[in-house]
């Protein structure tokens, strides 16, 4: 009963965050985070495919994440972005990297995980680029569904984004709120859903394998 109540509180919290963030919307090249606050164990790897639908652009990219140890985790992405420019769809390249450090680990007496993440994404279309530097604070909590490792992990947080480059009208700094769910459908396979809102609103989904 307590687990069900806690899960409902988390879902309500994310709904309030996202509804607040949807108050404004504008074109802004940014990507979903697709990460909980929990860092991978040393030597563990996750790889998967993600899709982001933003305002006037869509991104499709594979990503690999690797546990470095000492609560550190690194992620690398490389894929494609379709951008609507002057009513025409243009295809471009998306590359990115991020580094996550877990500050707090969930345990007895500690109700959640907390981490910080620094990232860099670069979108290149027609020899023009939109580069984004992000700093995120993410918190999450695991809810075990069975005793075999299947679980659901709601997560959310705040992100500071600095956008610049020749593909954007002017350099800009924005604040986003994000919320999502990682659902481990098996011990090695998971589904991710996320909504992110601030200067623009975007949503996305992804699948990952862990090994």
What residue ranges belong to the model's regions?
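Short beta-strand-initiation
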Residues: 11, 59-61, 176
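Outer-membrane beta-barrel transmembrane domain signature
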Residues: 26-56, 82, 107-109, 119-203, ...
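Generic detector of solvent-exposed, compositionally biased contiguous segments
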Residues: 22-34, 89-100, 175-176
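Glycine- and aromatic-enriched membrane insertion/assembly motifs of diderm outer-membrane
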Residues: 52-123
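Broad structural signal for hydrophobic residues in well-ordered alpha-helices, predominantly aliphatic
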Residues: 14-16, 64, 181
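Cleavable N-terminal export/targeting peptides
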Residues: 1-41
